């Protein structure tokens, strides 16, 4: 709470805020964590996971709408959809899952910076 106001994460309304850098950066790179497909599940998600998944779906819709109108120079979309909401303890596995994305990003970013 700040000055009597409850604040929420800015990602709630602007989950991919590349547009805030328009005209202020030579190269804009955005990491989209909202568009990754979710994992197939056979168990019932918790109430918290249902709420969070709803937020992810809404965030994905916002990102898709934003990208339809404008785009950053590079959008990175790592395959994080296979992980669950509270899998922070799986940092090593999450980073390992991004290895394939890393090679593509290095190539594209190198081309952008060389231009």
Over which residues does each language-model region extend?
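Patatin-like phospholipase
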Residues: 1-115
């Amino acid at each position: 709470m700040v000055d009597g106001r409850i604040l929420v994460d800015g990602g709630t309304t602007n989950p991919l805020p590349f547009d805030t850098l328009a005209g202020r950066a030579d190269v804009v790179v955005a990491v989209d964590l909202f568009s990754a497909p979710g994992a197939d599940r056979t168990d019932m998600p918790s109430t918290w996971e249902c709420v969070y998944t709803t937020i992810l779906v809404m965030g994905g819709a916002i990102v898709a709408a934003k990208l339809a109108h404008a785009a950053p120079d590079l959008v990175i979309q790592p395959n994080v959809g296979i992980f669950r909401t509270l899998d922070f303890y799986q940092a090593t596995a999450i980073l390992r899952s991004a290895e394939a994305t890393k090679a593509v990003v290095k190539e594209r970013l190198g081309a952008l910076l060389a231009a």
